UniProtKB/Swiss-Prot annotation:
This is Carboxysome assembly protein CcmM. It is found in: Carboxysome. Functions as a scaffold protein for the assembly of beta-carboxysomes, initiates carboxysome assembly by coalescing RuBisCO (ribulose bisphosphate carboxylase, rbcL-rbcS). Produced as a full-length and a shorter form; both forms are required for correct carboxysome assembly and growth. Its EC number is 4.2.1.1. The gene is ccmM. Residues 1-193 are annotated as: Does not have CA activity. It catalyses: hydrogencarbonate + H(+) = CO2 + H2O. InterPro entries: CA_gamma_LbH, CcmM, Gamma-CA, RuBisCO_ssu_dom, RuBisCO_ssu_sf, Trimer_LpxA-like_sf.
Length: 652
């Protein structure tokens, strides 16, 4: 199940866009909410409905084998830190083997020691709870330090240190109760992980199905019947048996086959080749019209060494000449409506040992790059992967679907390619899989595509080559005047520049700017407007090649706003005000009020560079056409005006 985790939003106190760090063995339910610098260690269980937000106080630490139950809220203040067991500062530290139960509130600065139990609806704020404490239900702990091994009865309000020091010690029965709750949640953790593992859940489903529908046995003599196994498969069975491997079978109907949900068949324990072949022939006959595959298992290493489909609906057993070792390729024709380029891309990924995954998003989520993971494709066989891929495209018709190539050893993505849009499938050219942090794929920007200029495409590629993160932001005309930008899509590889074209098409009436972020320095290195409501994209000639992390927009490039109504003197004054650190504002007045000097405050211009300031001024001049408009320069330190410049006079 996909984990819903987000980077911390940019705020006045934090602009590092930190994201959660989740250990591979931890289980985080998709209905939980993780934001910011949250560090989750091994075997942590986070239940649905929890909210862990490190967007103000940061970072958070959640120790190994800790369970966070439904409805828990963990948050922190901008100021205030605690010292964790590793000697570092944290907004919230939760130790190992801690149980935080339903509806509890942990608000930093807060420290919860190892082995603690926090009861239902209890609150810990600006406090330290020592190791081994048992806090019961509806308790408030604030501004105190609870010594280790203390028991806090239900309903108590602990707000003074004298109250904390007088608390009784934990008794044996309290420890047993806390251990009982922890044990239950560890069992839940194992159960949730098993439910997402086909190999674990399949035998349980098969057992339930056998209990509900007892099979009717039909024993028939095989003598005189034509054996459905081919000579090639007889060779494979013989080789597997000679090497000491076990042979088993799996089967699936057409619906389960599309989701790679195979059902386990019998394990053939006999060592006689004739007995094994007879058993396989019997199973093929029983499951006629279904998919059946042959499995070779190494009993010592407890892993599969061979997988091959030997029967398909409407076909006889499939011959194969592959050897008895894990196989990543099967020559097959394209499945259904899949584009030949998609099939070639999948084949290339499988040949290199990568795992295939898919993600989908509707038009609204696509604009914010909020992709949802589809059912995992565990198979390494090309026909099975293509069938599952086609089923995913059919299931999510009318949505965006992208193909993911995953390097399981390095635990990183090597390919992200959109293969379907709401209008239909996408024609793609096969690309060599590379880590998504790099970009050497060529992207066309000329010809019939007028949304992106060649300079802009080159600039994006330069930023990616330098290791920068590339994101987009957009704003309508009203928000643009106040510089209130909203987050758009994130571009992690040159292959996603097509996504940028779609994003520009969807926001034709908005301002869109491109942002380059240095992830190491955690600062923005580029902000440039690439699209305006008139539909024109900026022709960005400011390439970052050879400049390290120092690209900066200039007033003469990057799509600078039209300044035909502003004199060069005014532009120079605006530049000087910005360079001196002054803030800009506007005031407007009609002709009648102008005579009495009764100016009305306009929007405040929170621009970070000359481009944005001039664009915002132009937008205001258009909005207040026919009125007097003047620019105000304000010294934020002294809170006084340093300049008043008349920009526009009322029409007479």
């Amino acid at each position: 199940m996909a984990v819903q985790s987000y980077a911390a939003p940019p705020t006045p106190w934090s602009r590092d866009l930190a994201e959660p760090e989740i250990a591979p063995t931890a289980y985080v339910h998709s209905f939980s909410n993780l934001i910011g610098d949250v560090r989750i260690k091994d075997y942590v269980h986070i239940a649905p409905g929890t909210s862990i937000r490190a967007d103000e106080g940061t970072p958070f630490h959640i120790g190994s084998r800790t369970n966070i139950q439904d409805g828990v809220v963990i948050h922190g203040l901008q100021q205030g830190r605690v010292i964790g067991d590793d000697g570092q500062e944290y907004s919230v530290w939760i130790g190992d083997n801690v149980s935080i139960t339903h509806m509890a509130l942990i608000h930093g600065p807060a420290y919860i020691g190892d082995g603690c139990f926090i009861g239902f609806r209890s609150t810990v704020f600006n406090a330290r709870v020592g190791a081994g404490c048992v806090v019961m239900m509806h308790v408030l702990i604030q501004d105190v330090e609870i010594p280790p091994g203390k028991y806090v009865p239900s309903g108590m309000v602990i707000t003074t240190q004298q109250q904390a020091d007088r608390l009784p010690n934990v008794e044996e029965s309290d420890i047993h109760f806390a251990q009982h709750v922890v044990g239950i949640n560890e069992a839940l953790l194992s159960g949730y992980q098993c439910a997402e593992n086909i190999a674990c859940i399949a035998p349980i489903r098969n057992e339930l199905q056998r209990q509900e529908d007892p099979p009717t046995l039909h024993v028939e003599m095989l003598t005189g019947e034509k054996n459905t196994m081919t000579t090639d498969y007889g060779t494979h069975v013989r080789q597997l048996l000679q090497q000491g491997y076990q042979i088993s079978l799996e089967y699936a109907d057409a619906r389960r086959y599309r989701t790679s949900s195979w059902q386990s068949g019998p394990t053939l324990t006999g060592q006689q080749e004739s007995q094994v072949m007879a058993a396989i022939a019997q199973l093929l006959k029983e499951h006629e019209g279904e998919y059946v595959r042959l499995i070779g298992v190494d009993p010592k290493a407890k892993r599969r060494v061979f997988e091959e489909i030997i029967q398909r609906p409407g076909q006889a057993a499939v011959a194969s000449s592959s050897s008895s070792r894990p196989s990543a390729t099967v020559n097959a024709s394209p499945v259904g409506s899949l584009d030949a380029a998609v099939v070639a891309q999948v084949r290339q990924l499988l040949q290199q040992g990568y795992q295939i995954g898919t993600e989908h998003a509707d038009a609204r989520r696509y604009r914010t790059s909020s992709w949802t993971s589809c059912a995992p494709i565990q198979s390494k066989q090309e026909p099975e992967v293509l069938a599952a891929l086609e089923a995913c495209l059919q299931e999510h018709a009318g949505e965006y679907v992208r193909l993911i190539g995953i390097d399981q050893k390095q635990k990183r993505r090597v390919l992200e390619q959109i293969i379907q849009r709401p209008q239909g499938p996408v024609a793609i050219a096969p690309k060599t899989p590379t880590p998504v942090a790099t970009s050497h794929a060529s992207v066309s920007s000329g010809g019939n595509d007028t949304l992106l200029s060649a300079d802009l495409v080159n600039q994006i590629q330069d930023l990616l080559r330098q290791g920068c993160q590339v994101i987009t932001e957009y704003a309508d005309q009203r928000r643009f005047r106040t510089s209130s930008w909203q987050s758009g899509i994130k571009i992690t590889s040159a292959q996603q520049i097509n996504d940028l074209r779609s994003f520009l098409a969807e926001h034709q009436r908005d301002y869109i700017r491109l942002v380059g972020v240095n992830p190491q320095a955690k600062q923005r290195v580029l902000e440039t407007i690439i699209h305006r409501p008139n539909g024109k994209a900026a022709s960005n000639g400011n390439s970052t090649r050879g400049q390290g992390f120092t690209p900066r927009p200039t007033a003469s490039s990057q799509g600078s706003p039209s300044t035909h109504s502003l004199s060069q003197e005014v532009i120079e004054q605006v530049r000087q005000l910005l360079q001196q650190g002054y803030t800009l504002g506007l005031e407007h007045v009609d002709a009648r009020r102008y005579r009495t000097n009764s100016w009305q405050s306009g929007p405040r211009i929170e621009a970070k560079n000359l481009n944005e300031a001039l664009a915002a001024i132009q937008a205001c001049l258009q909005e207040y056409s026919g009125e007097y408009v003047r620019l105000i320069g304000i010294n934020p330190a002294g809170k006084q005006r340093v300049a008043e410049i008349l920009l526009q006079q009322a029409a007479k």
